[in-house]
């Protein structure tokens, strides 16, 4: 599980020795900018080897990332689902807009919090038969790995309600760089994978159980 590279593509080199079947990227691959500034990181991630599924973050610009990521071989999950053998993935990128005037922004992935629950519930029904159900988001749920430096919780209430009601097995997220770690909402494991720009990531192993190993400088 990776997140928050913010175009620092050299950090990807630290991960090249890992033996992984899949890369799940939880948003903010880029740091705003343009297609030209974003292109190196996108293609470097696509060249890592394993398949990559990715949700957009709030600094991944919607006016160019869908086409760029497709060209780089990245599979974007944003309001959509994917079945891979007996593992089901659903994804929702971006973040809730605290100011409603941001909704509909031409370059940013903002949404209203009340949209989160029904959208994810619909996607979750599409993977209902999967042995393991995994959610990828950029923003954490309210009250789980979402605490800012000032102590304020900055997660999504709608996402938390979805996790409480639907109880997927695992949620991977990023966004709040200072809130790396793991917690539980019911039986759902919530993992903020950390800021890859600082060399941080999470190694997930899925078998009969799910194991999570935090890797990088703060492990």
Q: Which residues fall in each region the model found?
A:
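Active-site neighborhood of phospho(di)ester-bond hydrolases with catalytic His/Asp-centered motifs
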Residues: 1-3, 23-28, 52-58, 76-78, ...
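Active-site environment of divalent metal-dependent phosphoester hydrolases
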Residues: 6-11, 30-35, 58-66, 81, ...
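Conserved catalytic scaffold of divalent metal-dependent phosphoesterases
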Residues: 7, 60-61, 66-154, 158
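Core catalytic region of metal-dependent phosphoesterases/phosphodiesterases
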Residues: 7-84
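Short, conserved loop/helix-junction motifs that constitute active-site signature segments
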Residues: 42-49, 128, 163-166, 185
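Binuclear metal-dependent phosphoesterase catalytic core
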Residues: 83-85, 107, 157-166, 179-219
């Amino acid at each position: 599980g990776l997140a928050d590279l913010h175009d620092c593509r050299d950090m990807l080199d630290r991960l090249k020795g890992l033996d992984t079947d899949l890369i799940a990227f939880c948003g903010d691959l880029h740091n705003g900018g343009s297609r030209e500034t974003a292109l190196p990181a996108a293609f470097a991630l696509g060249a890592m080897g394993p398949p990559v599924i990715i949700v957009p973050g709030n600094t991944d610009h919607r006016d160019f990332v869908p086409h760029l990521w497709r060209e780089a071989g990245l599979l974007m999950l944003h309001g959509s689902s994917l079945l891979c053998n007996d593992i089901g993935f659903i994804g929702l990128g971006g973040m809730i807009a605290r100011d409603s005037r941001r909704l509909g922004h031409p370059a940013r992935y903002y949404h209203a919090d009340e949209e989160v629950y029904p959208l994810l519930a619909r996607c979750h029904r599409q993977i209902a038969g999967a042995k393991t159900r995994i959610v990828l988001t950029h923003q954490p749920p309210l009250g789980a790995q979402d605490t800012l430096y000032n102590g304020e919780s900055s997660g999504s209430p709608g996402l938390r309600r979805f996790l409480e009601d639907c109880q997927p097995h695992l949620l991977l997220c990023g966004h709040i760089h200072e809130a790396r770690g793991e917690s539980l909402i019911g039986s759902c494991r919530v993992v903020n994978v950390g800021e890859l720009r600082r060399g941080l990531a999470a190694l997930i192993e899925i078998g009969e159980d799910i194991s999570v190993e935090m890797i990088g400088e703060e492990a």
